[in-house]
Amino acid sequence: MENILCFLNSYTETGLSPDSHWLDIDPNFICLSGLGLFILYLFYVVLTLYSSPTEKNNDIQKHQGRAKRRRKGGTFKGFPDWKSFQREEEEERKLLSLLKSFGPPVSCSPRGQHHDTNHFRRLLCPDPVCRVCKRATADIQQLLSWESLKDAAPSVSPLASSASATESSFTLASTPSATPPEDLILSPRPKASPPPPLILSPDLITTLADLFSPSPLRDPLPPQPVSPLDSKFPIDHSPPQQLPFPLLPPHHIERVESSLQPEASLSLNTIFSFGSTLCQDISQAMNPIDSCARHHGPPIPSALPPEDCTVTQSKSSLTILKTFPEMLSLGGSGGSSTSAPTIKGIDHSHLASSEFTWWQPHAKDSFSSNFVPSDFMEELLTLHSSEAFLGGHSVANLIEPVNISFLSHDILALLERQVKKRGDFLMWKENGKKPGSFPKQLRPNYQLNSSRNMLTSIAVKHDLAESFPFWASKGKLEWQHIHQQPPHSKCFEDHLEQKYVQLFWGLPSLHSESLHPTVLVQRGHSSMFVFFNGITNTSISHESPVLPPPQPLSLPSTQPLPLPQTLPQGQSPHLTQVKSLAQPQSPFRALLPSPLFLIRICGVCFHRPQNEARSLLPSEINHLEWNVLQKVQESLWGLPSVVQKSQEDFCPPAPNPELVRKSFKVHVPISIIPGDFPLSSEVRKKLEQHIRRRLIQRRWGLPRRIHESLSLLRPQSKISELSVSERIHGPLNISLVEGQRCNVLKKSASSFPRSFHERSSNMLSMENVGNYQGYSQETVPKDHLLHGPETSSDKDLRSNSERDLETHMMHLSGNDSGVRLGQKQLENALTVRLSKKFEEINEGRMPGTVHSSWHSVKQTMSLPEKSHSQIKHRNLVTLVSEDHCVDTSQEISFLSSNKQKMLEAHIKTFRMRMLWGLPLKVLESIEIFKSKADLSTSFSHFDLPSSATFISQGDSKDGVSKSRSRSTFQGEKLGTTSSVPILDRPHPVSSPVVQEGQGTLRRQFSDTDHDLIETDSKDGASTSLRRGTTDFQSEKLDSTSSFPILGHSYLVTSPVNQEKQGTLRREFSDTDNDLTESVRTTEDGRQTFLPPPHSIVDEVSQKQTVLASRCSAELPIMQAGAGCESWDKRKSSFHNVDRLQGSRKTFPVTNALQSQTRNNLTTSKSGSCSLTNVKASTSNETEIFPPRISVPQDPKSSYLKNQMLSQLKLVQRKHSQPQSHFTDMSFALDNLSSKDLLTNSQGISSGDMGTSQVVHVHLEDSGIRVAQKQEPRVPTCVLQKCQVTNFPPAVNRVSPVRPKGGELDGGDAGLGTSQRRRKSLPVHNKTSGEVLGSKSSPTLKTQPPPENLFRKWMKTSLQWFNKPSISYEEQESSWEKGSSLSSCVQNIGRVIRAAFTGTTEAQKIRKDTREFLEEKLGHRHGIDITCPQEPLSFPVGLGKAQHNPEVHVRAEPVQGCPCNYRAPSCKVTRTKSCSQQAIFVGQNYPTRIRQIIDKDRQPQKVEAFKGKILCQSHPQSMPHRKPVPHPNPTCRRQVSLVCPAVPTSAKSPVFSDVPFLTGQKMLPKHLQGGKFPPTK
C-alpha cells in the first residue's frame, strides 16, 4: 500500500511541475491513477467499517470529540435548543458505541446480521415490543452495515413501522413444510371464497418460538425475533379454519373487507410495533384485543366455516392485531392452521368492557397449562390490577432481578436516560406532532385513580366480572375493561392453578417505568399474578428449570371438532376451552394445585405456589402500587425519587371497602403504612394523624387558608354532629387541638376587617350586623363589659378579628333566634371544642375556629339582656362548671400533671378571652367606676365645648403610654371603647381610682386599621400604646386608650398614684401621611403639650362653647395654645355653625421632608390644636399632666356627640385644602445633651423635660400677642418623681434649644433656674391681662384662671427643680388677621460660636437682644418685645461647652408694653390666609432664610435654600402697619433669623453646623426687610 502511494505521489509531482509536458504525453495514466485512488479510498472505508470493536469505538470517540469541538465553535449558537439537542445526540452516540463494543464480529451474511442484532437486542431488554430498544437495535444495524440498512430501514424505524402497519390487512398461512422464515411472504385471498384465516408456517412458528424458549439462568434474555423483511415465502393454501369466537360488535367495525389487499411485506418489527399513540406504552402491548390477536390463537377446528375481518391501525390507538406462533406448541412434524381476525377501525377508547369479553377466552384457552412461554405472553395480555385478587390469597413468589454484571453504573444511567428521552420524544411526536401537545393521560390534571377503586366500580356494575386498570408507561393511564370468560363452557381449568409470576424487564429502572407492578392473567378458575420488579422473597435455590409433566385436557363441548396442537417432543397435547358470555366464572376459585415449580425464562421467573393459592397482602399491594406511582410521577414531573418517597410512605391510598367485600371479605389493614415497620404505638398514632391531614389536603386540593375561607361560607354544623363525631372518634389531645386552634386563629385573623374598639351591643345582639362602619360607645353593654375581672386575664386580649368573624358568620347563617346555646351546652362548650378539630381533620369540614366563634357569639348574645349581677354570677358559675368540662380521660403521657393543669387553665382563659375580649385592667377600671354611681352621675350634665384627648405623664421612668389612635373628623359615631372622657366641669374632679402597680403594655395588631395596642406590666406604671390612623374620611372617631378631658378649664386630678401614670400619645396618620404625636413625659427639663384634634360640641351650649374656647383669658388646659378669634368673628360664630370649623389654626412642628406625599398637617378643629409629624420618628412633645381619671361615660353624651359629628364634617370641608404650616424647630447642635429650660409664661417649669414646643396662635382684634399655653398644675408628688428621660433623637420632637440658667448666669444653675421660675410664677398665675397690664385685651380677662391651685402646684414644682435644668418658655406669637406675618425666627449667628460661660457676657447678650426686639417689633407691628432675663446659648459641636443664646420674643398688642414672655427660636405665626411661606428644608445645616417684609404689602414667603416646599398658602391683601425703624445695631449683632428648619433625618434635630447661620452684619438688613445672600 505504501509503495502504491509513493508511486502515485511521484508521478503526481512530476505531472504537476510547471515545466512538465507529461500531462500531454500520457493522459491515460492520470485516469488510472485517479481510479486507483478511489479504490484505495473504498478499501479504507471497508476496513474502517469492519474493523475491531475497539478500533471502531476509538474512532467514534474521536469523531465525537471533533463534533463536540465543532459544536462549541459552531454556527448554531443562536438556536435555542441546539445545545440540548447536541447533548442528546452525543449520549445516543455513546450508547450506540457501547452496544457495538459488546457485539461479536459481524459476518456478511444476513443471518449473521440478524443474530448480531438479536444479541444487542437482548442486551437492552427482552421485551419484543419495546419501541425504544428496537430503535437502538436499528441504530446498531445502521452502524454495522450500510447495505443492510437500506433494506431494513422501513422495518426497524419506529415511525416507518407504525406507518407500514396502517391500512394494511394480511393473512398469514402456515404449512407443514420446512420453509425458512426468510421466505415468509403474504398472498392475497381469493375474492369468491370466504375470508381465509391467518396462517403461519411451522418453521416460522419454530423460529418465533425460540424467542420464548427456556434458557439457562446465566442467559435469561430471549433471542431477538428474525426480521423477515427481505425474505419472502409463499403462502400455504391449506383450508382455512374458522375462529371459535364471535366478531366485534358492528358499531366498532369500520368496514369488513371482502377481499385482501395486494401482496404486502410485513416484518416482525412491524408486527411488534405500536400504533400512533405512545410508542413504548406497554398498555397498548397488553391490550386485550391486541394481545389476543398477536400472541394467542386458540385451537381451531379445521371444519368450521372460515371467517375473517380485517383490522388496520386507527390513528388514536393500537393498530394491527397480529397472530403469533406462541399460541401453538413448539416443535412437531405437523402443524394445524389457525386463524385470527383482523379488524379495521377499532377505537379502543370507546370499546366497552363487554365487547372485549369474547377476546378473553381466546387469550386464555390458547395456552397449554405447562407452556411457560405462553404464560409469559399471557401476562402481557391482561391489564394491571393490584387488587383484583384480594381474596384470601397471598403471593408466594417474587423474582430475582436480572443483573447485567458487565455494565457499570454510569453505563446503566446513560442507557436509562437515553431510553427515557427517546420515549418522551416519540410520545410527543406520535401524539399529534404539535408543540406542547401531550396526551390526556400525560397532563397534570389527569387524575391517577387507584386501581382498586376502578375495579370496585366495574365489579359492582358487572357482577362477578372484574375489570382491571391499565397502567401505561411514562405516566399514561388508560383504563380498559376486560371481563371474565364466557360462562357457558365446561372448564378444564380444574387442573390449573392460580399462578404468581413476577417479571423483570431488562436493566434496573430502564424499562420499569414502562411496566407495572401487578398483572392478573386469568385462565378460567385459575389466575396468574405477574409482578414486575418486585422484591424477591424466594431464593434462587428453589428454582428449577424442569417442566412439570403435561396434563391432558378434554375438549370443550361447545366446539364441534377438536383441534390437535403440535407440541414439542416429550409433551402431550394441551387443549383449552372457549367459554361463552352466559356463564361467568369466579376468577378466584383455585382448584387442583400443582407442584411448586419455578421457571426462569427471558429474564422472568414464574413462581407458582405448591399447595395453596394466595393473594398479595394489602401492604404488599400498596407497596407495588406506589412503586408504579413513583415512576409515573417521576416521568410526569421529573421529581426525584427522594421527594416522592414521602408520598409513598405516608400517603398511600386507603383500601376500598367495597372491593374488600367483593374479594372474599379481605379485612381492611389496620395500619395504613405500607410494610411492616417497627414503629411504636405513639409514633404510629402521630403518623396516622399526619396522614389524615394530608389526605384531607389532597382531597380538597386547596391550601389550608383557602379551605378555611371557603368553609366560612358554609352553613353551621349542628351540635349533634359534633357530639356524634366525638362519640365515634373520641376527643383529641388537648394540647394538640389547642395548638392547632391557635394556629388557625392566627391564620384567620386577617380574613375580615376588624377593629377591637368597635364592639357594641348592636353587633352582639345582631341588631346591626351588617353595619361595619362603627358603633356608638354609649350602646356598649356595660354589664357585659363590667363582669368579674377574674373571668379574664391581662394576657388574654382576644383578637378583634374573632368577634368580627363571629358576627359575619352569624350574619351568613341569618338565624339568630334558633342558634342559641343552652346553659348545659355552655357548660360543655370546652369539651365540644376538643372534638371540633378532630372532626375537621377527619371529615374536611368547617374549621374549629368558626365553630368556637359561633359558640362564643351565641353565649355573648344573651349577655346584654341580663343585669350585671346576673351576668357576673353566671360567669362565676360557668367558670366553676368548666372545671369539670375538660376531658382529661385521655392521659397525655409526655406531660406532667402540672403542665396538664396549666393547659387546662390556659384553655379556660382562652375561652373567656374569646367571650369577652377586654383587658383585665380595663375591666377592673370600668368595674370600679361602675360601682361609683355618685361619681358617674356627677358628669351627666357636662357641656362639651371642645375635645382633646388627654394623656398624662407622671413619671417617664415608670411608664409611657403611646396612643396612635384613628381619628376621624367626619364620623357619624364616636367610639371611645376603652377611654372615659372627662367632661367640662367648673371644679376639679377627684377620683379615688386605685391602680397601684398596675400597668400594662398591651399590643393588639389589626391588619385593617393598623391598630396597635400594647400593654405591658411595668412596676406601677400604666402604659398603653395604640397605633392607628388619622382618617379624615372615615365614619367613626376612636380615641382608644386615652381619657380625654373635654373643654376643661381646670385640671382633673387623681390623688392616688398620680406619679405612676403617664402616657405618650402618638397620632399616626397612615392615610394622609400625617403623624400627630404628643409625648408627655419628663425629659431634659422641659414640658410641652399637644391637644388632640377631637372636638365635641353640644348643640345647646354651642355658642357659649365657641366663645369660651376662643375668647377666654386663660385657655382650657386641654386646649393648650388655643387662641381666641377676633371679636367680630366670635360674634358671627354665635349664629353660624361653620365658625366651628376654626378660623384659628395652630400649626405645630412638622417634618416637611417626610411629608412629601401630603403636606397638610393635622389641624385642630373647633378650638383644638394638633401636632403633626409625618413620619412618627422625629417629633415628640413632653408635658407633665396629672394622671388620668376614668369617669364612666354618660349615656346622654351620645346626643352631644352626634351633634358634634355633623359639625366636624363642616370643619373638614372647609379645611380640606392644604393649610400653611407653622413649624417649631430645634437647632440643637451636635447633640441633645444640653438641657433646655421649659419656661412657661405663667411660670411653669417642668424640670428635666423634653425638647419641644408648640406654637400657639391667638388672634386678637386689637393686636397680636404671643400667648403661652396653659400648663397643667403639676402636684408635688408628680414633680418629685419626674426624672430626666433621654429619648433618642428619633423620638424626641424637634424644638428650639433653650439655655441653661446656670451656665448663662454663671452662678448656681439650680438656684438661678429656681429664682427665674419664682420670678415667672406670679406671671403664670395671672391672666394675660395681668401680665400685660392695661395693654391686655379685654377678651383675655373674661375667664381668670384658678390662681390658688396653680400657684400651689408651681411652688411645689419649683422647689423640686433645684438642679441644673433647662426651662422653656412656650409662647405664641401671631399677627392679627390682616396684619403682616411676623416671622420672629430667632437664632444666633457666628457670635454664638463663642462660649458664654460668664455672667457678664450673658447679661450683655440678654440686654442687647431685649433692646433690639423691643425696638424692632414694638415699632413695626405694635408689639412689645422683652428680651429674656437670662442669656441663651447653643452648644456648638467644637468640643467645648458652648451655648446657644436665644432671643425670647414677646408679641404684645399695639400698646407695646413689655412682658416676660419668651418666644422660641422660631415662631412663625399667622392667620389662616394672611401670609404665604415656602419653607425649603436643608439637609445637613440650618437653612438660610430670606424674608421680605414690605410696609405696604403683606410679608412675602419665608424661604429656605436647598429644601422642598413644605406649604404655601396664598395670602390675601391686608392692610399693614408702618414699617418699624431699624433696630439697635448692638442687638442686631446678636440675632439672626433662622427658619424653623425641618429635620431631614432622625438625627436632623441636632444641627452641628452653626456657622451656616447668617452672620451678624446681615441681621439689620434682614430685620429691615432685606434679603440674605447665601452664606457658606
UniProtKB/Swiss-Prot annotation:
Could you tell me which residues belong to the region Disordered?
170-197, 542-572, 782-801, 952-1033, 1293-1347
Q: Where is the composition biased (Polar residues)?
A: 966-980, 1020-1032
UniProt keyword list:
Differentiation, Membrane, Spermatogenesis, Transmembrane, Transmembrane helix
Ranges that cross the membrane: 29-49
Compositionally biased intervals (Pro residues): 546-565
Q: What superkingdom heads the lineage?
A: Eukaryota
Please give the Pfam families that the UniProt record associates with this protein.
Answer: DUF4599, FAM75
Per the record, the GO terms for biological process are: cell differentiation; spermatogenesis
Q: What GO cellular component term, any one, is given?
A: membrane
Does the record bear Transmembrane in its keywords? Answer: yes
Bias category Basic and acidic residues: which stretches?
A: 1004-1019
Membrane topology of the entry: Single-pass membrane protein
Compartments annotated for it: namely: Membrane
Q: Which PANTHER family match?
A: ACROSOME-SPECIFIC PROTEIN (PTHR21859), SPERMATOGENESIS-ASSOCIATED PROTEIN 31D1 (PTHR21859:SF12)
Family to which this protein belongs: Belongs to the SPATA31 family.
What functional role does this protein have? May play a role in spermatogenesis.
Name of the protein in its database record: Spermatogenesis-associated protein 31D1
Q: Which organism is it from?
A: Homo sapiens
Name the gene that codes for it: SPATA31D1
